[in-house]
Amino acid sequence: HMVTSIDGKVIGEFLNRPECEAATEIYYEMNREYKAQGSGGFICGRVTMEGSFTGGWYPDLSEYKPVARECGHYMNCWFDDVADAKYFAIAFDPKGKLGWKSNIIEDSDPGYGGAMIIEVLTEQVDPRYLAYLEEKEISYFFAGETEIDVPLALKILRDHLSPEFYV
């Protein structure tokens, strides 16, 4: 679900207008209800995650050594360790541009707060970004060469989290 302006925009000043207040509250109520009913999490693109959670901060990758993809084509070695988590924030971040401070979303809204982060990347990501994610213990996997292959990403999530996984 999503709140949009009449012209299809998903971000902008319209979200702060009094006329939109009821719609945005319904949006957040639905999100909290989905979480309470056992939704596996939520998926957002890089721009939304940046605007809502990372604030545009980006790590200095010069401090990191490139990580080789040793665990196969699609996921890092410890991806399966997240399967016990109850709720996920799945970031479609093709080029690896999000600057997370930890591996958990810290947000006052219970519909988002406490979600474990999983990064969905493409193979064009800087291998130093993988080292950054591993330092933060953020799980990631690859779903596409230059663009995210959404059906593949959803299949990987279901295969590694739960066959009943839904967002």
Q: Language-model segments: which ranges?
A:
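Active-site ligand-binding patch in enzyme domains
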Residues: 2-6, 12-156
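A contiguous pocket-lining binding segment that forms or flanks enzyme active sites
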Residues: 157-167
